[in-house]
Amino acid sequence: MNIGRGDQRRTILLVDSDPHCRAALRLALEGAGFSVGEAANDEEGERTALRVKPDAILAELLMDTPHGRGTVSERLKADGSIIPCYIVSTASEALMGSVGLHELGISGVFLKPIDTAIVIQTLKGRLGMGDSGA
């Protein structure tokens, strides 16, 4: 895991049950100058987020959550977290109209297949990073 702030890189936490999706996003994000942490499920994602304090989280939407505890973003928001959390999903645009994303603590949605250039541009804009660093 490439997590840390010694080089002042912004840290992104990937929470996705698909190791191939995590690997593809990791390569793109690290290539753009981000540090990347990974978690395979929401519970692990919550623990990792509390430990490493990422600058943003990309989390799979349709993931089993233990005991109906809600998504990682909902649980972190309930604990007072202000970490921007983006959903990664195969769901259609209908989802976005039917769910109050901000009420769930969601900053935005990226649809699979992921366009990594859009993800990187969005994260850099949200985190105040210029294009000059990557």
Model-predicted regions and their roles:
Residues 67-71, 78, 91-109, 117, ...:
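Alpha4 helix (beta4-alpha4-beta5 surface) of REC/receiver domains from two-component response regulators
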Residues 17, 87-93, 113:
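Conserved active-site segment of CheY-like receiver
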Residues 38-47, 68-69:
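Helix N-cap/capping motif at the beta->alpha junctions
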Residues 19-37, 104:
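Two-component/phosphorelay signaling modules centered on CheY-like receiver
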Residues 52-63:
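Active-site beta3 strand of CheY-like receiver
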Residues 1-19, 77-78, 111, 115-134:
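Non-catalytic signal-transmission and effector/linker regions of two-component phosphorelay proteins
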Residues 50-52, 75-83, 104:
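Conserved phosphotransfer cores of two-component systems
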Residues 15-16, 39, 57:
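Conserved sequence signature across two-component system core domains
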